[in-house]
């Protein structure tokens, strides 16, 4: 047998063994804390990104070393690349899509979402691409490529899984279902009108027999959340982020029907879920026009809003709006974190949210009652105070003007899409923050021409630093802040993950993967891999705990060197 045949035979044995191991995912198990798996966007439904694994801890973190590296080649039939220093290349690509003339896309290979880990297999996605990878050694088992019509390839937040089936959204607005064992397509369904310039990036969330997906648009179309049957792909319900007609609840926060129908607010990040209350919590995007409120006077519900929906019906249970009348593209899209804990001496079911606008909120997740609002950075200067419902009051003098106005934070926010973490052992909420100041100049004298993201020039003029910030949710006080060392003085935030091994993992602005002490932010270990995408994940296989991180188009798995 020649070397090529031996390599192909070896790959077949690996794929066969991995496929035999994969037995699918029971949806009922997603709600349990992640131990030997990472079955949904945040590891479980809570949004806390906390793992109970303890094999890797403060006493042995110095022995953490690289176990394997796997670079994922996006595109149609890209030649295979070795997944390890030696070994077979990638398997043939499975191609899907509805066009014979796909639009070429550059730089679509960055992993910017969650990587699922179920039964020893990693499931990874970027725009138009999905892979299965052996979680023990990084071998690519299959690759699926979607021939796209185009759209906004801003990122893909990951996949959802139900039994033996995977689901992901495409930038040209399709929901695609794959066989997890083979990568072959089961079906695909349009979920939005591509001609209206919607784009779809959200990681689908599986809740029982519901597949929850969101769709967004920065060009004046209304956003919506939808639920599909994971078996058939049939639509179960659809909830718009603006009222559908005048007279509906919330319509009084818009001046007219036209502004409401072009109001934006699409959800573009996954939410969290309470199985006891049967409520799904998520945030919506900014209203449009993004930087001018002249044509949309009012609070503009339900944009830049935290929303609770009944999973079975799609009916609104409650809402809270962190950024009323948002005119700086801040959204409220961050994944809410749900915690059961004491607040002011009483046990409460809580929802925690660090918003892009620089304010930290604590809500009662049963009723939506506001409990706490406090800035978690010194930077925010756009609010005149807090109203009786706990919402910051926008200062109209901080809207873009021809002469420019200094606003903090900038349009990217104190935090953007990178997920926070909550550690029940310390009781602290952790978030990566970036204090940046911008001058906002209005460049379009006609407010009716300021559609979408147009009509404003933003000049970033200063930065107060990148931090990891630890917040006591009971008081809103900052317990500690760790200033990220930066050669340039600027950088990007990364998501965070906490473990029961008394570790907090994240990336820094210089491209290091870092383990911190969650009690004080002291760095305990680091290694350079490039900017960490999304956030670290962790899982246990064969008695060995792995730390998984992505940077660019590459996966890095670390484990203890025994």
Language model regions located:
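Blade-edge beta-strand/turn elements of extracellular beta-propeller
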Residues: 66, 141-146, 180-195, 231-242, ...
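Loop/turn-rich, solvent-exposed surfaces of beta-rich toroidal or solenoidal domains
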Residues: 433-435, 460-522
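Conserved blade-ending motifs and adjacent loop-strand segments that build the rim/top face
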Residues: 324-335, 375-381, 386, 409-410, ...
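Surface-exposed acidic, glycine/proline-enriched linker/cap segments
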Residues: 89-101, 244-267, 342-344, 383-413, ...
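Blade/loop signatures of beta-propeller domains
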Residues: 24-71, 75-94, 241-248, 392-395, ...
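Repeat-blade elements of multi-bladed beta-propeller folds
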Residues: 38-42, 105-128, 151-175, 199-222, ...
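N-terminal cofactor/phosphate-binding cores enriched in small/glycine residues
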Residues: 54-192, 499
């Amino acid at each position: 047998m020649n070397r090529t045949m031996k390599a192909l035979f070896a790959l077949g044995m690996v794929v066969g063994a991995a496929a035999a191991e994969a037995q699918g995912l029971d949806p009922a198990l997603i709600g349990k804390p992640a131990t030997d798996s990472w079955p949904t966007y945040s590891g479980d439904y809570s949004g806390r990104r906390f793992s109970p694994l303890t094999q890797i801890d403060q006493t042995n973190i110095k022995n953490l070393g690289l176990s394997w590296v796997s670079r994922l080649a996006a595109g149609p039939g890209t030649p295979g690349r070795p997944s390890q220093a030696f070994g077979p290349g990638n398997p043939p690509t499975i191609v899907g899509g509805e066009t014979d003339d796909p639009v070429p896309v550059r730089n679509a290979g960055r992993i910017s979402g969650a990587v699922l880990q179920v039964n020893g297999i990693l499931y990874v996605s970027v725009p138009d691409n999905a892979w299965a990878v052996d979680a023990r050694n990084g071998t690519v088992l299959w690759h699926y490529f979607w021939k796209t019509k185009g759209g906004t390839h801003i990122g893909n937040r990951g996949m959802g899984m139900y039994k033996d089936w995977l689901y992901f959204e495409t930038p040209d607005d399709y929901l695609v279902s794959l066989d997890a064992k083979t990568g072959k397509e089961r079906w695909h369904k349009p979920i939005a009108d591509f001609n209206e310039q919607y784009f779809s990036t959200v990681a689908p969330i599986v809740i029982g027999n519901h597949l929850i997906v969101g769709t967004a648009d920065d060009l004046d179309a209304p956003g919506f959340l939808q639920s599909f049957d994971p078996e058939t792909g049939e639509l179960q319900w659809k909830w718009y982020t603006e009222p559908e007609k005048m007279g509906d609840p919330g319509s009084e926060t818009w001046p007219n029907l036209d502004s409401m129908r072009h109001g934006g607010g699409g959800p573009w990040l996954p939410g969290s879920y309470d199985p006891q209350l049967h409520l799904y919590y998520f945030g919506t995007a900014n209203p449009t026009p993004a930087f001018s409120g002249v044509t949309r006077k009012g609070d503009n519900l339900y944009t830049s809003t935290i929303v609770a929906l009944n999973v079975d019906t799609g009916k609104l249970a409650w809402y809270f709006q962190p950024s009323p009348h948002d005119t700086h593209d801040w959204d409220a899209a961050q994944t809410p974190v749900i915690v059961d804990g004491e607040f002011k001496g009483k046990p409460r079911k809580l929802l925690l949210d660090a918003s892009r606008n620089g304010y930290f909120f604590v809500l009662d997740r049963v009723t939506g009652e506001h409990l706490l609002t406090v800035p978690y950075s010194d930077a925010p200067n756009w609010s005149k105070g807090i109203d009786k419902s706990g919402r910051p009051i926008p200062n109209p003098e901080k809207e873009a003007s021809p002469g420019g106005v200094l606003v903090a934070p900038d349009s990217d926010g104190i935090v953007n899409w990178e997920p926070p973490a909550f550690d029940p052992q310390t009781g602290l909420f952790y978030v990566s923050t970036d204090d940046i100041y911008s001058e906002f100049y209005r460049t379009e004298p006609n407010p009716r021409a300021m559609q979408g993201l147009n009509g404003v020039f933003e000049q970033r003029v200063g930065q107060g630093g990148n931090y990891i910030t630890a917040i006591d949710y009971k008081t809103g006080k900052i317990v500690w802040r760790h200033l990220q060392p930066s050669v340039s003085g600027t950088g990007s935030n990364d998501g965070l993950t906490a473990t029961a091994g008394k570790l907090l993992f994240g990336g820094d602005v210089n491209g290091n993967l870092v383990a911190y002490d969650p009690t004080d932010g002291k760095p305990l270990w680091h290694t350079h891999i490039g900017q960490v995408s999304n956030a670290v994940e962790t899982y246990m296989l064969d008695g060995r705990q792995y730390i998984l991180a992505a940077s660019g188009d590459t996966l890095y798995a670390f484990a203890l060197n025994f």
